[in-house]
Amino acid sequence: LDSLNIESTVAFDVTGELPSNLNHLPFNLISTPDKDVYKTTYVFDCGSSSRLGKLESLVLNSEKIVVVDHHIDPTFGDLQIIDPKAASTTQVLYRILIEEGLSITQEIADCLMTGLITDTGRFQYSNTNSEVFSIAADLMSKGSNLSSISENIYGSIELDALKLQSKVIERIELDRELRFLHSVVYQEDYSEFKTTPAETDFLIDVVRLAKESDIALLLKEQTDGSFKGSLRSRTDFNVQQLASFFDGGGHKAASGFSSDLSIDEIILNIKNEIRKQI
């Protein structure tokens, strides 16, 4: 938008510090919205307005809302540019930039590459196809350093976060019949291990590694006592349907939700939903 001389405000609702493993991204562009109504608002990678947090009312008051996503059936937006087969929303955005003949700088390429790397699990998930590799190659030709970005995201973790990882692993409970496992991060863990919620985003990818499970859940306690859940699937099992039970969303292999229920109630409901699918 800057290259087109279009005035814009970049906003992102986040609680606490942004994750340090994403410091290579231009977070300096993020600012606090200073208008009550915006003419056009673009929303990326968000299937439900409820997931916009404090920005929800501001976005919904916009004259026009454009949703760019790879999640199925977003519940809001005047214009929806969606491809549920895309591995990442950045894959959809890349196509838009190319089709419109817009320049992709190294800084833009790094942002797009980050989305590809994280949403494909370093190009390991089943959503990784030939187009993903073609886009990654083009982004590298524009100056994006795949190796450096991948190392920054996955190869460098604070020691305290590693210590918390061991605690989360200790808490894992496995239902062998359903091939479902889950663990939890409590609020007190953040103070005990001197970490922030943003620094624990990688933990779901640790929990999902157990070969005895097909479905993994990591619950994170929020300051108000509610829980945010991250779901992952290692097979064709559709965890989006599990998330939708709690009015959450995502896609087949990875989804999320929020709930005011207790841990036991959340687990019971998820197990019941799993039984309906198998």
Indicate where each model-derived feature is located.
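Short, hinge-like loop/turn segments at secondary-structure boundaries
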Residues: 26-30, 60, 82-86, 234-235
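Short alpha-helices
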Residues: 68-135
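Short glycine-/acidic-enriched loop or helix-start segments at secondary-structure transitions
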Residues: 51-55, 77, 228
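Hydrophobic/aromatic beta-strand patches that form the interior of the parallel beta-sheet core
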Residues: 9, 40-42, 64-68, 79-82, ...
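N-terminal small/polar loop signature for handling phosphorylated ligands or for N-terminal nucleophile
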Residues: 1-61
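Short glycine-rich anion-binding loops that position phosphate/pyrophosphate groups of nucleotides
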Residues: 46-49, 71-73, 187-188, 222
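Hydrophobic helix-and-loop "lid/oligomerization" segment in the mid-to-C-terminal part
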Residues: 1-20, 37-38, 118-278
